Amino acid sequence: MGKKSRVKTQKSGTGATATVSPKEILNLTSELLQKCSSPAPGPGKEWEEYTQIRALVEKIRKKQKGLSVTFDGKREDYFPDLMKWASENGASVEGFEMVNFKEEGFGLRATRDIKAEELFLWVPRKLLMTVESAKNSILGPLYSQDRILQAMGNIALAFHLLCERASPNSFWQPYIQTLPSEYDTPLYFEEEEVRCLQSTQAIHDVFSQYKNTARQYAYFYKVIQTHPHANKLPLKDSFTYEDYRWAVSSVMTRQNQIPTEDGSRVTLALIPLWDMCNHTNGLITTGYNLEDDRCECVALQDFQAGDQIYIFYGTRSNAEFVIHSGFFFDNNSHDRVKIKLGVSKSDRLYAMKAEVLARAGIPTSSVFALHFTEPPISAQLLAFLRVFCMTEEELKEHLLGDSAIDRIFTLGNSEFPVSWDNEVKLWTFLEDRASLLLKTYKTTIEEDKTVLKNPDLSVRATMAIKLRLGEKEILEKAVKSAAMNREYYRKHMEERAPLPRYEESDLGLLEGGVGDSRLPLVLRKLEEEAGVQESLSLTETVSKVKAAENGLVNGESLIPNGTRSENESLSPEESENTTGDTEESSGSMDAVKERL
């Protein structure tokens, strides 16, 4: 994506002339693998571990300096070749051009008026780099033997990209030459830029991403040097950390899901041309047309000639955008922060609370979200907080009697409080919890705003501080919202106002009979109405998808974080509705299994 590629462009033709002993690097990578495979550090020790791993990585990078495969010239020099290649192979190339938009980097600009919902871009399967094409490439023999490559499609795609980049006659060279040489993902942050994220919620994922990427590189360096099926790979004589970091970032910022050719499963893919579109708020307008076997995109809105063409990547928080896509999106209507809550097993009423939560399809301990938009909490979190704050008598009312099931159904509905006292308690609790989270930051909102005025601040440091500031602003907003609700319900309690009562016909949420198995669906229905996207299983997600014209579908990611096994099959219903999701579905390399 353009926004992810503001940094310098790829520069040189083949590997460089520096010499370093493979055995020397093998020893260093063995040390790195051991360090990255050690147990997770204790509280407060994560930064120390990060700096130790980073020191080893930097030592390896220094030894390998000049060994990476790169390209001559700037990436934009290759745009004409990309358009010619795409056109010759059946992609649409009319109506737009690739342009540098300064702050957002490269993107697509309309060269004619494009109407909302007009099909303006399509890319056939043959142009896509997929896990399937990786299996059929020079990587195939190693793929067939390595369980990590088989289980983690994103890693297989990264190696596919590296092998094709190192092959001058690769079919995908016109595409690969237009990819940026560096990214703004945290893997490229300087240590001081990472330090800007200290005390944020995102820092733990940043540490994990860096550690797992280092571990993967160390593991695969040994594989490439020693595995008999790696002998013919063009990486045998030159596989640097810089190469792997680039491939990892290329994939995590660009990968998407598409159905396999027979439509029975989903696979990961890189989609040339389409992946030049930058993000804005809206709806997903990209899907996969199985009949024509191509990725298709309709216009999100009316675009006039000269306008930048945007698409919607999905409901990602800014932490996800920064960590996995390498950019911060201002005014992100889907921004949120995590809040971990659970019912203590030492709670005298634990068993009763656990049972009520189970009937509502909610775990006794989970990570919820506080949202940038109103309301700040989802129906699921509201239901959890209500149960969390219930008295013994209130719990009995939700477990026993003819109206118990009906009460469960309205747990996530803000219009029907359990009691005024319960509402006061839950909003007081949320206010206190958000206030405590705010106090964990080392800087204030005002201090962050002052730092952002510094004209010498790097792009990556700016992203980090904006992310830090955004987290605090969401928490501060939650505190204010909770305080307002607390006082609202306290007033009702003092006035002894009658509780709103519902009629069975008001629910309108049941499909068929009443039963405990339907309860989670009610909360999910409320989530939809509130505009809140909670994580659902693959089947549940597909069932929500509505087919649109041109075989396109607007839907959520079918593979959370792109880490589902490539061997997992889809049901016929899922196969019919599977789409190529936008960048919102981009997964990260830090999802690699712990055994790596």
Curated annotation (Swiss-Prot):
<feature type="domain" description="SET">
    <location>
        <begin position="94"/>
        <end position="314"/>
    </location>
</feature>
<feature type="region of interest" description="Disordered">
    <location>
        <begin position="1"/>
        <end position="22"/>
    </location>
</feature>
<dbReference type="InterPro" id="IPR025785">
    <property type="entry name" value="SETD3"/>
</dbReference>
<dbReference type="GO" id="GO:0005634">
    <property type="term" value="C:nucleus"/>
</dbReference>
<dbReference type="GO" id="GO:0000785">
    <property type="term" value="C:chromatin"/>
</dbReference>
<feature type="binding site">
    <location>
        <begin position="275"/>
        <end position="279"/>
    </location>
    <ligand>
        <name>S-adenosyl-L-methionine</name>
    </ligand>
</feature>
<dbReference type="Pfam" id="PF09273">
    <property type="entry name" value="Rubis-subs-bind"/>
</dbReference>
<dbReference type="InterPro" id="IPR001214">
    <property type="entry name" value="SET_dom"/>
</dbReference>
<dbReference type="GO" id="GO:0018021">
    <property type="term" value="P:peptidyl-histidine methylation"/>
</dbReference>
<dbReference type="GO" id="GO:0005737">
    <property type="term" value="C:cytoplasm"/>
</dbReference>
<comment type="similarity">
    <text>Belongs to the class V-like SAM-binding methyltransferase superfamily. SETD3 actin-histidine methyltransferase family.</text>
</comment>
<dbReference type="GO" id="GO:0061629">
    <property type="term" value="F:RNA polymerase II-specific DNA-binding transcription factor binding"/>
</dbReference>
<dbReference type="InterPro" id="IPR044428">
    <property type="entry name" value="SETD3_SET"/>
</dbReference>
<keyword id="KW-0949">S-adenosyl-L-methionine</keyword>
<feature type="binding site">
    <location>
        <begin position="325"/>
        <end position="327"/>
    </location>
    <ligand>
        <name>S-adenosyl-L-methionine</name>
    </ligand>
</feature>
<keyword id="KW-0599">Photoprotein</keyword>
<dbReference type="GO" id="GO:0046975">
    <property type="term" value="F:histone H3K36 methyltransferase activity"/>
</dbReference>
<feature type="region of interest" description="Disordered">
    <location>
        <begin position="551"/>
        <end position="596"/>
    </location>
</feature>
<keyword id="KW-0832">Ubl conjugation</keyword>
<dbReference type="GO" id="GO:0045944">
    <property type="term" value="P:positive regulation of transcription by RNA polymerase II"/>
</dbReference>
<keyword id="KW-0539">Nucleus</keyword>
<dbReference type="GO" id="GO:0042800">
    <property type="term" value="F:histone H3K4 methyltransferase activity"/>
</dbReference>
<keyword id="KW-0963">Cytoplasm</keyword>
<feature type="binding site">
    <location>
        <position position="254"/>
    </location>
    <ligand>
        <name>S-adenosyl-L-methionine</name>
    </ligand>
</feature>
<comment type="subunit">
    <text>Interacts with MYOD1.</text>
</comment>
<dbReference type="Pfam" id="PF00856">
    <property type="entry name" value="SET"/>
</dbReference>
<dbReference type="InterPro" id="IPR050600">
    <property type="entry name" value="SETD3_SETD6_MTase"/>
</dbReference>
<dbReference type="GO" id="GO:0003713">
    <property type="term" value="F:transcription coactivator activity"/>
</dbReference>
<dbReference type="GO" id="GO:0051149">
    <property type="term" value="P:positive regulation of muscle cell differentiation"/>
</dbReference>
<comment type="function">
    <text>Protein-histidine N-methyltransferase that specifically mediates 3-methylhistidine (tele-methylhistidine) methylation of actin at 'His-73'. Histidine methylation of actin is required for smooth muscle contraction of the laboring uterus during delivery. Does not have protein-lysine N-methyltransferase activity and probably only catalyzes histidine methylation of actin.</text>
</comment>
<keyword id="KW-0489">Methyltransferase</keyword>
<dbReference type="GO" id="GO:0070472">
    <property type="term" value="P:regulation of uterine smooth muscle contraction"/>
</dbReference>
<dbReference type="GO" id="GO:0008218">
    <property type="term" value="P:bioluminescence"/>
</dbReference>
<dbReference type="InterPro" id="IPR015353">
    <property type="entry name" value="Rubisco_LSMT_subst-bd"/>
</dbReference>
<protein>
    <recommendedName>
        <fullName>Actin-histidine N-methyltransferase</fullName>
        <ecNumber>2.1.1.85</ecNumber>
    </recommendedName>
</protein>
<keyword id="KW-0455">Luminescence</keyword>
<dbReference type="InterPro" id="IPR036464">
    <property type="entry name" value="Rubisco_LSMT_subst-bd_sf"/>
</dbReference>
<dbReference type="GO" id="GO:0003779">
    <property type="term" value="F:actin binding"/>
</dbReference>
<dbReference type="InterPro" id="IPR046341">
    <property type="entry name" value="SET_dom_sf"/>
</dbReference>
<keyword id="KW-0009">Actin-binding</keyword>
<keyword id="KW-0597">Phosphoprotein</keyword>
<dbReference type="GO" id="GO:0030047">
    <property type="term" value="P:actin modification"/>
</dbReference>
